[in-house]
């Protein structure tokens, strides 16, 4: 004997399917949102290079500082699609973000030039400016960036 589906049963089935689809979609979004962006890899490499410079300065290995400085000044950039997402999020602060990057570039370039001359004091001064530029950018953007692209932690 067959029973015709009543409206309530149909509604329950439709609602269950809709909730399952929505939950699956949200799960996929949260995984995508926590997937590391290319910028994270760039920042990790910059961190390693800055640590290597610190070690080289402590040993007065100016040739190594001269080798590392351009890697910091002309660091890799994320792919264009990621840059567009970041710039869209930055909005009117995009100029400030670019200025921070420009300051890092200029200070790291000066550090490399000083290292080539063997001018330890100038290397340390330029390294300090490089580090201060990194810190200014991180203090201005890191927390809100992480919240925007990785969720609150």
Positions of the model-derived regions?
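Bacterial N-terminal signal peptides that target proteins for export
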Residues: 2-14
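Sequence context surrounding c-type heme c attachment/ligation sites in exported
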Residues: 29-153
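Intrinsically disordered, low-complexity basic tails and flexible linkers associated
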Residues: 24-27
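Bacterial N-terminal signal peptides
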Residues: 12-22
């Amino acid at each position: 004997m067959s029973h015709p589906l009543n409206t309530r049963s149909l509604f329950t089935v439709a609602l269950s399917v809709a909730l399952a689809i929505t939950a699956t979609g949200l799960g996929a979004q949260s995984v995508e949102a926590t997937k590391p962006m290319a910028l994270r890899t760039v920042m990790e490499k910059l961190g390693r290079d800055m640590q290597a410079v610190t070690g080289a300065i402590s040993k007065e290995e100016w040739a190594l500082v001269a080798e590392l400085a351009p890697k910091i000044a002309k660091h890799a950039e994320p792919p264009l699609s990621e840059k567009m997402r970041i710039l869209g999020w930055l909005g009117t602060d995009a100029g400030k973000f670019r200025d921070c990057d420009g300051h890092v570039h200029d200070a790291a370039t000066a550090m490399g030039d000083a290292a080539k001359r063997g001018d330890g004091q100038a290397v340390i001064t330029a390294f300090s400016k490089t580090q201060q530029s990194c810190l200014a950018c991180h203090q201005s953007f890191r927390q809100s960036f992480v919240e925007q692209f990785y969720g609150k932690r």
